[in-house]
Amino acid sequence: MAKKSMIAKNEQRKVIVERYAAKRLELKKALVDPASTDEAREAARLGLQKLPRNASPVRLRNRDIIDGRPRGTFQKFGISRVRFRDMAHRGELPGITKSSW
């Protein structure tokens, strides 16, 4: 079980990323636009630097939705590999069976 503070911090980051997503996209487009001037690129670069660090989606962590485990998470299911195995053995995941050949 992850610390509740770490789970809460990640949730807060999700909110911040969502809040600044449109502005970040606009500034990123200005940086790579071949028609923009050097001054416009410089202004876009400075604008990106002024955004909060937590506005970057790279700082988000995929966590298990049940207990918040930060590593070994299956994106398709939103749970960790450990929880996935337990739930699959108990038959709680429809369509998932243990392979045998």
UniProtKB/Swiss-Prot annotation:
<dbReference type="GO" id="GO:0003735">
    <property type="term" value="F:structural constituent of ribosome"/>
</dbReference>
<dbReference type="GO" id="GO:0019843">
    <property type="term" value="F:rRNA binding"/>
</dbReference>
<keyword id="KW-0689">Ribosomal protein</keyword>
<keyword id="KW-0687">Ribonucleoprotein</keyword>
<comment type="function">
    <text>Binds 16S rRNA, required for the assembly of 30S particles and may also be responsible for determining the conformation of the 16S rRNA at the A site.</text>
</comment>
<comment type="subunit">
    <text>Part of the 30S ribosomal subunit. Contacts proteins S3 and S10.</text>
</comment>
<protein>
    <recommendedName>
        <fullName>Small ribosomal subunit protein uS14</fullName>
    </recommendedName>
</protein>
<dbReference type="Pfam" id="PF00253">
    <property type="entry name" value="Ribosomal_S14"/>
</dbReference>
<keyword id="KW-0699">rRNA-binding</keyword>
<dbReference type="InterPro" id="IPR023036">
    <property type="entry name" value="Ribosomal_uS14_bac/plastid"/>
</dbReference>
<dbReference type="GO" id="GO:0006412">
    <property type="term" value="P:translation"/>
</dbReference>
<dbReference type="GO" id="GO:0015935">
    <property type="term" value="C:small ribosomal subunit"/>
</dbReference>
<dbReference type="InterPro" id="IPR001209">
    <property type="entry name" value="Ribosomal_uS14"/>
</dbReference>
<keyword id="KW-0694">RNA-binding</keyword>
<comment type="similarity">
    <text>Belongs to the universal ribosomal protein uS14 family.</text>
</comment>
